[in-house]
Amino acid sequence: MKRSILALASGAFILGAAEFVMMGILPQTATAMHVSIPAAGHYISAYAIGVCVGTLILVFGRKVSPKHLIILFMAIALVGNTLSAVSFCSPMLLVARFISGLPHGAFFGTATLIAKTLADKGKEAQSVSMMVMGQTVANMLGVPAGTLLAEAMSWRLAFAILAAWALMTIVVVILWVPSIDPIKDAGIKGQFLFLTHPGPWLILLAVFFGNSGIFCWWSYVSPWLQKTGGWSATMVPMLMVLAGLGMVVGGIVGGRLTDLWKAGATAALSHGIALCGLLLVFLLPSNHATTALLTFIIGFALFFNSSPQQLLMVQAGEGGGELIAGAAVQIAFNFGNAIGSIVGGAALTATAMNYHFTGIAGAPISLLAVILLVLYTRRYEARA
């Protein structure tokens, strides 16, 4: 892996860990902030809302070097994670999580452009997948480590370490990432012209619905494993490693398959796998074997679609809208996360905390993603 891509992957690691670690430490933060588990799910939603708002940075940063934008995003991540580590009440943690989410979509939009620009010809999707790999490694190692720290010491330590990592990443980005020219300045309106076509909207809606469905379940994976799977709290970090391994494998397979096959079809396949997994959460009897298997499968599906969807949108935005297009995927992804967390929490409240229903609540939403991507593939990729 090129050092420049490694530096970008380090940033992706921070943002991935900051976003997903909350799923593993939700019970501890709920206890510390004196709120219920469904109410603590709002910490996930706050991050996701920050992602959506933070993309506005790109609208006004279009004339800035992408490298300098990456440094800015890491500085914001440093502030957000520091505040999360020292939060003493629920409103403060909500604000801290919002700030932590601000750089997320903008980072991935910018980093995707850099990775694509620095890639060897014909290996653009693999280069993007290597950058995104930082996020998948965060899920395989960072999230379980954070969960373990929360069990053994304090959930605050996880955010403190992420803040220190953000500072280190600023240094390696300065040293290793080459400066590339800003994208063509198409003006504020020009950056959004790609959204006048239906294709990008099909992709974005698919990302939104696909992740809404998955996060109905994933937002509550830690208590699901314990309450329905019978796993002890000390085993949850190991199961987070299993989920992260699924994400890493999914990211690698998705990147390679996208370069060899059609990106839209690859993304449709990934959401189909997630749909099957969510149905099985509801249908299969809960025991150690089934919960572990489903944790791996749905984790695999979650990052199988990252590279194809990210690449499709950056290509759709060519001509001045690449940064906004790349960030738009993360907006849809995280807006989906926020809605999924809320829907999953509502399902739990309505069923007296029956965690099986997080799967059946998410399945029909994921089905919409499959339908949208099949439509996209037939309309745009069948001609290729």
What residue ranges belong to the model's regions?
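Helix-breaking motifs and short loop linkers at transmembrane-helix boundaries and internal kinks
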Residues: 34, 86-92, 230, 284-286
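Conserved MFS/SLC helix-loop-helix module at the cytosolic interface between two early adjacent transmembrane helices
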Residues: 53-91
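Helix-to-loop junctions at the C-terminal end of transmembrane segments
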Residues: 54-66, 250-262, 348
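Paired small-residue
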Residues: 80, 91-100, 289-297
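Helix-loop-helix hairpin linking two adjacent transmembrane segments in secondary transporters
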Residues: 90-92, 121-177, 220-224
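Cytoplasmic helix-loop-helix junction between adjacent transmembrane helices
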Residues: 96-134
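Intracellular juxtamembrane helix-capping segments at the cytosolic ends
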Residues: 106-119, 304-318
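A late C-terminal transmembrane helix in Major Facilitator Superfamily
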Residues: 316-353, 362
